[in-house]
Each structure stands twice: as C-alpha cells, then as structure tokens.
Amino acid sequence: MLPSIVTPFIAAMLASWVALLLHELAHSAAAELVGVRIWGMRLGMGPTIWKGSFNGRELHIGAFPFLGAVQLLDEDAGAIGYRDIVSGRWRFEWGPDAWRAPIISAAGGVSNLFGMVLFLVTWELGGEPGMGSFMGQLLLFGIVTNFSGYLNLLPWSKSDGGHLLAHLYAAKLLRPVRAMS
C-alpha cells in the first residue's frame, strides 16, 4: 500500500498533465482555426521523457507537467508578427495578419475556464479533493486547472499573459507608463 501522501500527489500530477494537454490543444485548435500551421507541441519542462509524433506533428513530453508550448511553423509565425524566432527570443510587430496571434494566445486561457466551471459545479455538489471518489477527482482536476490557468495569465515573457501584453502593446492599444520622479 502506498503512503497516504503519495496517492494525492500522483493524482495531482495526472491532473496537471491532463490540464496542460487540454490547454495546449486549445492553442493548437485556435491556430488551425485561424489558418496558422504548427509543427509540434511540447508538454512539460525538464528532460524529455518521450518524443514521438501525433497527428503528423512532433510531440515532446518533459518530465514535469508545468509549462508547454505549441510551435508554429517559422513562416506562419513570421506572417502573424513574431520576429527573431530563430535566436530563441521573440518580439511581436503588428501587421495585417497579426490579429491571429492574440486569438492563439487567448485560447489556452479559454480552456482553463472549463476547469473553473468544473471546479465550481463539483464544489457545489459537495466534492472533496482526492482519489476517493469521481467527484473528488473532478474537483482536484478543477483546482489544478484553475491554479495553472491563473499562473499562465501572469505577464512574463513565456506565458500567455506575456504574449497577450505584447500583442496589445504592438497594436498600440497599450502604452508603457513612466513613473513620475
């Protein structure tokens, strides 16, 4: 029998993987919807524990279920405004097809709304987090999805929040504010 802390930890890790997969699939579906091709997807960080192909695209799975990315084809990424992709750094310039980029960036957050609804419904129905019941598993999944979704909206460069901020700035819908001295 596993120690009592191991089972909830494994459950939380599995919930994290599922939440991350749904989040990245939402980005992928949005890219396809607006006509932007992708060549691969990365799920998780750390050393790659599995590499293969899925639906004709490369798929890399990292050891830890945190952070993910949908990799756009370079020419499509350039067409919608991303620059300096080859160097590993990026910046965003607004252009005629740039309206597609915020849609792709926002799609992951929309998938996290599913987790929020799931959490609220399960909580109202009396679920308690854990592996003991189906309701507990749903509640745990909702908690993990909400937590990862909120972190992803923070405006750091590799997050969806950071990408959305860059899109708003490039579209001149957002201006930097200078502190008064």
Which role does the model predict for each range below?
Residues 1-181:
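Hydrophobic transmembrane alpha-helices and their immediate loop junctions
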